[in-house]
Amino acid sequence: MQTREVKMFNIARIDLMKGRTNANLDELKNILLANYDNRLSDVIDDTSFEDSVCPPNEICDQIISEMITDFKAATDEDLVIANYWGHIHEKNMSTTLHNHFDAYVSAVCYVEVPKGSGCIVFRPRLNQYNNSAYASRFDPEKGVYYMFPGYLDHFV
C-alpha cells in the first residue's frame, strides 16, 4: 500500500474568553438602575434604545482593568476601551441577533442574574445553509464576563 502525505489546516477559529470579576457588583447594579431611563438613543427602533448610560465609575474601571489584564495574559495583546453601557433585561426580555462590527473585541459582564435569565448565544456565520449550525450558548452567571470578537453575532 502506498503511503500518502495529507495535511489538515484549520481555516476558521473563534476564541471566546470567560473570566470573573472581583468588583462590587451590588454597588454597580445600583448605578445602572439609577441610569436605566437615561437611554443611549431616544429612537425606539434604534438598537441603542435598549442600552442605558453607565457613567464613569471606579467599579467599571476595576472590571475593565481585570478584562484588559486577563486578555493580555491570554493573547499577549493590548486593548483600549472605546465605550461601555448598561443593558438591563426585564422579565421575558430578549435581545435580537446583532454584533459590534466596529469593535475588535466586545465583552459582556453579568452584574445580576435573576432566576430564569436567558442564555447568551453566539452564532458565527460559518454555514451559509444553516445559521445556527455552530451556535454556542452560555448560561449567565453573576460576576462572569465573556470577551469575544466584535464581529461575532450574538443574542439573548
Locate each region found by the language model.
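Non-heme Fe(II)/2-oxoglutarate
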Residues: 1-77
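Catalytic core of non-heme Fe(II) oxygenases with the double-stranded beta-helix
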Residues: 80-147, 151, 155
